[in-house]
Amino acid sequence: MNWKKSIAVALSAVTIMAMVAGCGSNTATNDQKKIGVIQLVEHPSLDAANKGFVDGLASKGFKDGQNIKLDQQNAQADQSNLNSIAQRFVSDKKDLVLAIATPAAQTMANASHDMPIMGTAITDYVTAKLVQSNERPGGNVSGTSDMTPVEKEVDLIIALVPNVKRIGAIYTSSEINSQLQVEKMKAYAATKGITVVEATVSNVNDIQQAATNLVNQDV
């Protein structure tokens, strides 16, 4: 996540905290608002989103130990950990939860249908079945998207390689956000007379072989 996305996360946090501050419920000792952060795994982009959230709150006067109580939890990419964290946040009656990455948001949303949940590092909330509309989320879930501008990426490839006819796309087959972006790329590339050749991977160890396979297919 780049700095612009981190700022977007921070601004969203400030907006939601303003609403939470006005509701006057579920307060902790000394009227501290209880905020939970559930992060899928340690990763530079996810860590940046986390930092942007905390920094954004601090810039508007919301500081841990003063008027808010932050509860930072990392699931270490373990679904059972996500479930446990989500259930604990519900039991603790958090005033707001930041869910970092799609699985974290899905788990948190399944655990509570009324607790305010803000997501980040999520590509498409509708595809992830978190909301019914990205434009008007409704419900208790909202947040920021990290959707890649695939159309601009295809246009850049065309600008660099004017005669391009085939583009290779390596992505994680089990990740719905990756699937969504590849489908968008295929649809847009088709309008330019370009074929997208897919190569799926299960983990980072598969990437080199996937790239080799694409090269062998004259991509």
Which residues are covered by each model-predicted region?
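Immediate post-signal peptide segment of exported/extracytoplasmic ligand-binding proteins
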Residues: 24-36, 60-67, 137, 158-166
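Pocket-lining segment of extracytoplasmic ligand-binding domains
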Residues: 170, 176-219
